[in-house]
Amino acid sequence: MTKHHADNERIKRQYFAFLKDAKGNSETTVDAAAKAINRFEVYTKHRDFKLFHVEQAIAFKKHLAEQNGQRSGQKLSKATLYATLTQLKGFFHWLAGQPGYKSRLQYSDAEFFNLSDKDTRIATARREQQAPTLAQVKYVIQSMPSGTEIERRDRALIAFTFLTGARDSAIASMKLKHVDLIANSVDQDAREVKTKFSKTFRTFFFPVGDEIREMVAEWVAYLRDDKFWGNDDPLFPATRIALGATRQFEASGLEREHWSTASPIRTVFRDAFASAGLPYFNPHSFRNTLVRLGQDVCKSPEEFKAWSQNLGHEQVLTTFLSYGEVACQRQGEIIRALATPQQAAQSSPDEFADAVVKRLRNSGVDISTK
């Protein structure tokens, strides 16, 4: 049974290079494209792309809609269908302009990978993002053991995520020198820290509790004072795996190196929430928690702008659109409160006049009568 087609492999390599070097896409995006194209090739039994016709796209859409997810065991979601087909649409649109394919494919052929308007709306609909409450996060952190250095690292890791709102990929690549306990800040330098869109910015510790900051400070002090680690050593080092007494590989302290991916961080979160008897919330959900906290504590546009910048957002609109929707329960509270008639506060003419006079005097205007 054919596992690949030589011409297909060559043109795919060109496309992946185009995505990475011309379009500037990340490795994650390129991998998503490769996965989608492979799904299609498996379905067509690796038929030459030059023999593509629109009936293949139509049949593949039906086939994909009938497939079950490997993890869930249920039908693939509309969002998964949309993401896969969008990648294929982009690939075949590009392919139609390449030498050797121009005479066989038309740009409009790629349009047959579109979902119906109804399914597209379902796939792209915005849904309320789940996030833990402040009390839940603190309960999880306080429930975590701290007897071994691995346990101390794990507890400090979740506390640090809560304190800074940093993304897991950034945390996995941070060094000790990036944390300033005097200024209560973290320098997310894109030259060394894997930030989103390679942005460089400074994050000041969010006001989530002195006990949370203290856990992070104790961890930094442990690495610097007890283990004598320096500025370029990892803030949250990887777990050392060694052969144990039972001749089985097991965790044995910490390696003096970074985690290669953020996957172990998500595992720490999953285990911590499970041990606390709470549903799993991933590291990114803490950013939603912090946005909701900001909506409560910020009293002016300037304050919320600073809060937004602290999350690495250049525009406040990003915070509102991506994270800042009003939680459903809070939405109900606001609407019910608005249904209650409220007495509008009105100033008397004398009060208004006094306010004007005060403002003029503060501005240095001479209003004395002559």
Task: For every predicted segment, state its role.
Residues 98-101, 161-186:
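Short, charged phosphate-coordinating catalytic segments
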Residues 254-309, 313-316, 325:
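Short, basic (Lys/Arg/His-rich) helix/loop patches that form interaction surfaces
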